[in-house]
C-alpha cells in the first residue's frame, strides 16, 4: 500500500476518517478509533492483505467484518488515551517517535493549546 492509495479526510475527537483506493479495496470513508495518523497506513495494509487473502484463497469473511474490526480496534500503548489530553505511546525507534509527534501536532493544529511531550527511553534501547 502506497501513501497515494489512502487519504486522511478528517482527524477529530480521537478518531480518523480516511479513504482507501487500490486494486483490492475501494472505500471512500473508513473510521479508526485512534488519533494516531500512522495507524492509517497500518490499517490500510491490513485491510488490503485481508482482501487479497480472501480473493486468492477464497476465505469466507465479509468485508464489513474486516472494516468493522479494523475501525474498532484499540492499540494499547500506541497513542492510547489515558485521560483528556494525556496519551501514552510506545514508539521505540526514530520513525515511530516522529510519527507520534506528527499525530500530536495534527491533533493540536487548530488549537490555541500547546502540547507537551514527556519522553523516556531505557539505556538498553539506545
Residue ranges and their predicted role:
Residues 1-29:
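Extended acidic/charged loop-beta regions that coordinate divalent cations
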Residues 24-126:
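Nucleotide phosphate-binding/pyrophosphate-handling subdomain across enzymes
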